């Protein structure tokens, strides 16, 4: 009997060791750059423009504009934007899938219980006649041996999916921030053009007044006054399209902030200074710039997940091995179950 138990234990330990070392399917390796492509592209090595800096780009890159109002708008959009909240919810869901996959690699337990009521008659033996209640309780334990690595590949696929969703979240975050900066810049640029156009209209009105006065004095002809009026009308006609452009930018900004289109910050109507970066733009080296792109990271992680699923599909061709056991008890009282 001892020999049989020892043999069973040996088989169990061996199976566990094999399960920890074996996984069918291809092992994922990140795609390598072609041999002729260096770590830093030639364009970045040869570029010596003072407009760029090899320093890494900060996470809050919009602060390079040194505009407190813009900083507040971006931070507000990152908190309330609907697309960003959807991406965050998807990321939490994928992380929950990873936790579930990892939980399957451990011991699974289950508890069950029940109660039954029966009536017996007095036949002179056993229990006396009457109604009796019976309580049942049991515990079950099971463990799946990951002999061919199916659980391992499942965890790898789930983790890669979560990483891809994290990259998608970063992409959504960058997109929201960039759209806010773009809408804010468009609104301020339109405001600056409106200020210039309005000033031009005022100057032309003064010029027309002088022309009409000179015409009455005989210094100018009626044709000169007509030309001045036509130029004034042309300048006045250029203002409404600029105002429409500013309103469109402000409406877009309001939507990015999770507001109704007309509920944009009122102070933006007075913005006439276009935000600019007054320092060298930090971009890092070429390799860092590529690694920073979330769409590239998302594609690479999607490839890793697809590779892991090849292993899952291969593992499904093999039988699965699980060890299990259960223990139960029956009593007529709760105290008797313990």
Spans of model-derived segments:
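Long hydrophobic segments that form regular secondary structure
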Residues: 298-318
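Acidic, Gly/Ser/Thr-rich repeat motifs that build Ca2+-stabilized beta-propeller blades
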Residues: 94-101
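Hydrophobic, lipid-facing positions within transmembrane beta-strands of outer-membrane proteins
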Residues: 133-141, 183, 285
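Terminal intrinsically disordered/low-complexity segments used for targeting and assembly
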Residues: 2-79, 135, 155, 159, ...
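Extracytoplasmic/secreted envelope proteins and their assembly/folding machinery
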Residues: 71-74, 88, 98, 184, ...
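Periplasmic alpha-helical coiled-coil/stalk elements that build and connect Gram-negative outer-membrane
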Residues: 151, 167-285
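Small/polar (Gly/Ser/Thr/Ala-rich) solvent-exposed segments
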Residues: 85, 105-131, 142-171, 190-193, ...
